[in-house]
Amino acid sequence: MEGENNMEKGLLLAKKEDSANTTPLLIFSTFIIVSASFTFGAAIGYTADTMSSIMSDLDLSLAQFSLFGSLSTFGGMIGAIFSAKAASAFGHKMTLWVADLFCITGWLAISLAKDIIWLDMGRFLVGIGVGLISYVVPVYIAEITPKHVRGAFTFSNQLLQNCGVAVVYYFGNFLSWRTLAIIGSIPCWIQVIGLFFIPESPRWLAKKGRDKECEEVLQKLRGRKYDIVPEACEIKISVEASKKNSNINIRSLFEKRYAHQLTIGIGLMLLQQLCGTAGISSYGSTLFKLAGFPARIGMMVLSLIVVPKSLMGLILVDRWGRRPLLMTSALGLCLSCITLAVAFGVKDVPGIGKITPIFCFIGILSFTMMFAIGMGALPWIIMSEIFPMDIKVLAGSLVTIANWFTGWIANYAFNFMLVWSPSGTFIISAIICGATIVFTWCLVPETRRLTLEEIQLSFVNV
């Protein structure tokens, strides 16, 4: 209780602070950190338009390609196991250097692959890299940004992911799958160099007892004229409170005091992966062909709209708030899945089946747009905000593993579900999207314009 009272006093001091400036260092640091998110997006979208050419060039069966497609998510699960612990022990920057090494090696292995072994190994290594990236990037951004722009800056993670998706969608129509793999590695090289010029997270420095460095970095991030004393005090009090709970273990996560945060974190990650995005992002070209719509046109249109819609989400996240944007996104996804279910459901019906191509196009287009403005980024943003420092490592690892494990299953199963029933597949997705609305309404709190410590204290006072 004493730690909680001290935190409340610190928050009273912090509330007196003015809005911090958005400094060049803050913008540059965010850009360098999210450059790896481009590789994350490229890995997600890589199989969407390369399926037929890879299967033809390397003589793969559907099962072999499905395994290849799912290996990035399996590798991501392995990376996720170590992501939070590595970031806590060695820092966010060092963890990202290791992630870049995995991604660069993996993309090169794919581009040079002569058989299924090198192809699968490369995909698995990329997966480990993006598994590390998936946790570190949103957490680092949340820890360096002031509360009034935290949502927008953290949303840039999703924006760069969508840029990666858009690039492989668009250039997949013209370039070979080997060249696309090389393109996927370029942002990692940028980050490898850029990490030398950005600071470590102030909260990580404070946790390691490097208080002077914490204050120096905080001053650089906020601007010379900004009074960092209230925020630095808030961070120190939070660190002190977490040290009093240093005996936290995996069992502690399931105690009543953490149940709400853990339910939100894991729940949103499961709903994100099961809403249908694994199939649409990875096998969009296959869906267009199945519906009789020109796959090249469909993929080019998707590549052009996904980034502008992400920009819309970036603008709205700190204006509307997390809850309204998440529920709006989930509603749009639900309607999109219903549209796709209808499109494939009437495909073989005489006289009505001709609407399948255009309905499929509308469904995939609207799904991609609605996912980009909310459901793609918000689970990661909320995950980076809700866990207190004493359980952030364990909870972050568990939540990230849950995301990747579910994604692996969904990605591998999608092709087989399409063989079973395209319409039935999207009916299931629509139900899950509807459940997301109810879940958000009942359990997810609004975190807009609150500091990380204020958010975490709000769960204590529930």
UniProtKB/Swiss-Prot annotation:
**Assigned GO CC terms:** membrane
How does the protein's chain sit in the membrane according to the entry? Answer: Multi-pass membrane protein
InterPro entries, per database record: MFS_dom, MFS_ERD6/Tret1-like, MFS_sugar_transport-like, MFS_trans_sf, MFS_Trehalose_Transporter, Sugar/inositol_transpt, Sugar_transporter_CS
- According to its UniProt record, where is this protein located? Membrane
Family listed: Belongs to the major facilitator superfamily. Sugar transporter (TC 2.A.1.1) family.
State the taxonomy lineage: Eukaryota, Viridiplantae, Streptophyta, Embryophyta, Tracheophyta
Q: What does this protein do?
A: Sugar transporter.
The alphabetical list of record keywords is: Membrane, Sugar transport, Transmembrane, Transmembrane helix, Transport
> Which source organism?
Arabidopsis thaliana (Mouse-ear cress)
Record GO terms (molecular function): sugar transmembrane transporter activity
Q: Which domain of life is it from?
A: Eukaryota
User: Main localisation, per the record?
Assistant: membrane
Gene symbol here is SUGTL5
Name used for this protein in its record = Sugar transporter ERD6-like 12
- Membrane-spanning ranges: 25-45, 62-82, 101-121, 124-144, 151-171, 179-199, 262-282, 297-317, 326-346, 358-378, 399-419, 424-444
Which cysteine pairs are covalently linked by disulfides here? none
List the NCBIfam families hit by this protein, alphabetically: SP (TIGR00879)
